[in-house]
Amino acid sequence: MLRRKPTRLELKLDDIEEFESIRKDLEARKKQKEDVEGVGTSDGEGAAGLSSDPKSREQMINDRIGYKPQLKSNNRTSQFGNFEF
């Protein structure tokens, strides 16, 4: 590894303003999400996320990542196709 002098980073006013605007935007989104979750808890939907049921937890994860599992049948046509001789 080569030794070199540390690179100097300068914090500019534009950078600070950009950081503040992004932080405010993220805080607004977080508040909005908390408000939506607050409404869901009164309906009982929010409690499902806290339950220890592995099926519901797995389903929540699959929904979050967009995974839709397909059930596989165990017959030969599904494994090898429909071959006719």
Swiss-Prot record:
It is found in: Nucleus. The keyword Ribonucleoprotein does not apply. InterPro entries: APC_suCDC26 (IPR018860). One of its GO terms (cellular component) is anaphase-promoting complex. Residues 26-36 have a biased composition (Basic and acidic residues). Keywords: Cell cycle, Cell division, Coiled coil, Mitosis, Nucleus, Phosphoprotein, Ubl conjugation pathway. Residues 71-85 have a biased composition (Polar residues). The keyword Cell cycle applies. V-shaped homodimer. Interacts with CDC16. The mammalian APC/C is composed at least of 14 distinct subunits ANAPC1, ANAPC2, CDC27/APC3, ANAPC4, ANAPC5, CDC16/APC6, ANAPC7, CDC23/APC8, ANAPC10, ANAPC11, CDC26/APC12, ANAPC13, ANAPC15 and ANAPC16 that assemble into a complex of at least 19 chains with a combined molecular mass of around 1.2 MDa; APC/C interacts with FZR1 and FBXO5. Belongs to the CDC26 family. This is Anaphase-promoting complex subunit CDC26. It comes from Mus musculus (Mouse). The gene is Cdc26.
